[in-house]
C-alpha cells in the first residue's frame, strides 16, 4: 500500500495516494513516514490545516520545515515564532530550516532569529581563478577532458537539471586535473571563511574543522536550466565555470540567488534576488542553505560547470 501511495503521489494523483497511504496505516500505524506523505498530499490539494496535522505526527528530515511552512501559509505568526525559537536551540545548523526561516522572516517582516545564516544573500562571493589555475599548470580543457570520461546522464530523475545532463560522484574518480582543482578550492574556501570571519552566525562561527567534497558536473544545452533548490547536506556550495555560451543576452546562462524557493506562497512580492552571469574561470561560493537556479539561454554552445559542496565531518 505504501509503494502504491508513493506511485500516485509522484503522479500527482493525490486522492488516490491518500487512499493507499491510509490503508498502509491500517496495517502498521508505526509507519510515521506515511504521515509525512499524507501531509504532502493534503498540502497539494490546499487542505493546509489537515496537512499540518499529519506533518506534526510525522518523523521525517523535512518535518519541521513543512510545519513552519504551514504556519506561514495559515498566517500563524506566533506559532511560527515559537517553533523557530525552539528549533534554533535544538538544531541550529539545519540547512532546510535556514532556507525557510530566511524566506518567512522576510515575508512576515520580522527578524530572522535562526542562527545558521540569517542573511544568506550577503555571503555570495565570486572570484576569477584563472591565475590560480595557471600557477598550478591546470588548463580548462584538461578539466573538461577528464570529466567527460565520466558518463553523463540526461535529465536524471529526482534532480534539478532540465535540458541538460549531469555526472555525479566525481570525487570517486582519480582525475589528476580535478585533484589540482580541488587543491585550489581548499585554498579559496579558506580565504572565503577568512573574508567573513567577523560575521556572527553559525555558518561562519561553527565552520567545519574537517570536511569532505562532493563534486559533480552539469552540462546545459540551449534553453536548459536548473530549477530552484538548496543543498541541504552541504555547508558551503560553489561552482567553477568551464564553458559559457557566446552571444547570450542580459542574464541568460546566469545563476540567480533568492530567498524564495520550493514554490512557497508569496505574500510580499518584492523578494530580494542576486543574479550573477559567470565567465569562464569564475568561482562562485555561497551558503548551501541559499536557494539558487540557473537562467535558460539560447545558443548553440553549451554551459558547463563543476559544482561542489563541502560536507562537515567535524
Which stretches of residues belong to each language-model region?
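Non-heme Fe(II)/2-oxoglutarate
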Residues: 110-204
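Structural marker of alpha-solenoid helical repeat scaffolds
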Residues: 27, 57-61, 90
Amino acid at each position: 500500500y505504501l509503494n502504491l501511495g508513493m506511485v500516485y503521489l509522484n503522479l500527482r494523483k493525490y486522492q488516490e495516494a491518500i487512499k493507499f497511504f491510509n490503508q498502509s496505516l491500517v496495517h502498521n500505524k508505526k509507519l510515521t513516514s506515511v504521515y509525512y506523505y499524507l501531509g504532502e498530499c493534503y498540502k497539494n490539494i490546499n487542505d493546509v490545516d489537515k496537512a499540518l496535522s499529519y506533518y506534526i505526527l510525522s518523523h521525517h528530515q523535512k518535518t519541521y520545515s513543512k510545519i513552519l511552512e504551514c504556519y506561514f501559509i495559515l498566517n500563524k505568526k506566533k506559532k511560527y515564532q515559537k517553533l523557530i525559537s525552539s528549533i534554533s536551540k535544538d538544531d541550529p545548523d539545519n540547512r532546510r530550516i535556514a532556507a525557510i526561516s530566511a524566506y518567512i522572516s522576510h515575508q512576515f517582516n520580522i527578524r530572522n532569529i535562526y542562527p545558521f545564516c540569517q542573511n544568506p544573500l550577503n555571503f555570495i562571493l565570486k572570484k576569477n581563478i584563472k591565475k590560480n589555475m595557471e600557477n598550478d599548470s591546470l588548463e580548462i580543457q584538461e578539466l573538461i577532458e577528464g570529466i567527460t570520461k565520466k558518463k553523463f546522464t540526461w535529465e536524471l530523475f529526482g534532480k534539478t537539471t532540465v535540458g541538460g545532463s549531469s555526472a555525479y560522484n566525481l570525487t570517486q574518480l582519480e582525475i589528476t586535473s580535478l585533484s589540482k582543482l580541488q587543491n585550489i578550492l581548499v585554498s579559496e574556501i579558506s580565504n572565503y571563511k577568512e573574508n567573513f570571519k567577523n560575521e556572527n552566525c553559525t555558518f561562519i562561527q561553527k565552520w567545519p574543522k574537517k570536511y569532505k567534497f562532493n563534486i559533480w558536473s552539469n552540462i546545459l544545452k540551449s534553453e536548459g536550466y536548473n530549477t530552484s533548490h538548496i543543498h541541504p547536506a552541504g555547508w558551503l556550495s560553489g561552482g567553477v565555470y568551464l564553458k559559457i555560451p557566446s552571444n547570450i543576452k542580459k542574464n541568460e546562462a546566469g545563476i540567480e540567488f533568492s530567498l524564495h524557493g520550493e514554490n512557497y506562497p508569496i505574500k510580499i512580492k518584492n523578494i530580494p534576488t542576486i543574479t550573477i552571469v559567470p565567465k569562464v574561470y569564475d568561482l562562485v561560493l555561497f551558503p548551501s542553505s541559499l536557494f539558487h537556479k540557473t537562467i535558460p539561454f539560447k545558443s548553440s554552445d553549451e554551459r558547463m560547470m563543476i559544482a561542489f559542496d563541502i560536507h562537515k565531518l567535524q
